[in-house]
C-alpha cells in the first residue's frame, strides 16, 4: 500500500466498529493517526473493541455520546450502516468535520487499480465471478468491500500488480468524494433501502457516486435492459459499456441463446455454471470486465461454465442419485425467487419456500409456480404460500424447518429432479439470518449424501 502523510497526527473518530471500522482503525493507526473508536455495543460484549484497546487504540463503548465531538476531531470515519441523520453524524457535519468512508480511505492508499461493483441485486455473484475470471486468466484479483473483506484491510496487502475487485453498497458509496475505480459495474437499480436513503432518487444518486470521479479513460458497465441506464449514461464522463439480455448492444449481449461481446461469441447460456436469467446478466457484466482486462475468450468461457455460484445465492450444492440440490437461501423476497425459478424446468423441480410473514400475498409468484412438481412449505408465511400454491394448482407438503423440508423433498424426488431452497421470505421467524437457514440445508444435504 501507499504510505501517505494525510492523517499523520490527525485526531480521527471511528464511528461504529464491525469489520470495516476495525480495519479502518488499524489502517489509520498504521498511518500515524490518533484514533478513537466509538461503538454502541458494550465493551464487555465487544471482542473487537477489546482487541483494539490491547493495541493501544482508545475505545469508547456502550453508546454514541454527542459530546465526544467536542474533542476537536479532524476527521470522522463512519460505519456504512449508520445513517446521515444519526445525531453524531449531524453534529459532525454541523461542526464541519470531514466524514470519510472506509472504502475511500482504502482508495487513498491503494497501489492496485480498483474494479467496483454495485447494484440492487447480483453484486456478490458478479463480484465473485469477475475475480474468478481474472484469476483464471493469470491476473491477481483480490475480493474486497461489502463481500466480507473490508477494503481497508485488503488494501494493506495489495500491490501494484494486483486488482481490487470491490463490492460496494449504496451505504458505502453515499459519502465518497475522491473514490475512482478504473472499471465500475452497476448490475441493476431497484427500489431498495429506501428507509435509509429516503427515496429512490436518493438511492440512485448514492449508487451513481461510483462514477463521480471517473474519466473517459475509465469504463462504466451499465444494464441496458433498464431505461434508467440510458438516462444516467448521458451524465457520466466515463466510457460506457452496456450489457443486455434483450437486445444487441455495443458491449455484451445475449442473442439466440449465446452470450457475445461485440459480435464475438463467448459462451452458450446453457453452458453457464449457474442457472437463472439474472445470472445471464451477471455473466454478461463479467464478460465485459474480462474483455476490458484482456482475458482470452476461452478462459472466460471455461471459468463461467465451472462457476458454481456464491454460498446461499443459487449455489449448486451437489447431487445425490442424480438429484441436484440448489441453495438459494439469500432469496428473501418474491423477485429473487422469481429469478431463481427462471433457470429451471418446473416439471422436474421441488421448491422449498416460506419464512417470515410480512403480511404480503404471493400472487405475483403464482405464474412462476405453474407446473412445479411439488412445493414444501414452511414458516410463518405458510398459509399465504399455500394460497399461492393452490392458485398455481401445485401440490404441497408442510415442514417444520429446512432440515425436515429437505428430507421430505428428497423422498419425493426422482432421478433427474432438482431440489431448490428459494424461500421468497426472510428467515427471522425461525433462523437468525439467511446464512444459518442455508447452512441447515447444506448440513442436511451432507447427511443425506452420507446415508445414500
Curated annotation (Swiss-Prot):
ATP binds at residues 119-125. SUPFAM superfamilies: MurCD N-terminal domain, MurD-like peptide ligases, catalytic domain, MurD-like peptide ligases, peptide-binding domain. It comes from the Bacteria. It is found in: Cytoplasm. Keywords: ATP-binding, Cell cycle, Cell division, Cell shape, Cell wall biogenesis/degradation, Cytoplasm, Ligase, Nucleotide-binding, Peptidoglycan synthesis. One of its GO terms (cellular component) is cytoplasm. InterPro entries: Mur-like_cat_sf, Mur_ligase_C, Mur_ligase_C_dom_sf, Mur_ligase_cen, MurD. GO terms for biological process: cell division; cell wall organization; peptidoglycan biosynthetic process; regulation of cell shape. Its EC number is 6.3.2.9. It catalyses: UDP-N-acetyl-alpha-D-muramoyl-L-alanine + D-glutamate + ATP = UDP-N-acetyl-alpha-D-muramoyl-L-alanyl-D-glutamate + ADP + phosphate + H(+). Pathway: Cell wall biogenesis; peptidoglycan biosynthesis. GO terms for molecular function: ATP binding; UDP-N-acetylmuramoylalanine-D-glutamate ligase activity. NCBIfam families: murD. Cell wall formation. Catalyzes the addition of glutamate to the nucleotide precursor UDP-N-acetylmuramoyl-L-alanine (UMA). Belongs to the MurCDEF family. PANTHER family: UDP-N-ACETYLMURAMOYLALANINE--D-GLUTAMATE LIGASE. This is UDP-N-acetylmuramoylalanine--D-glutamate ligase.
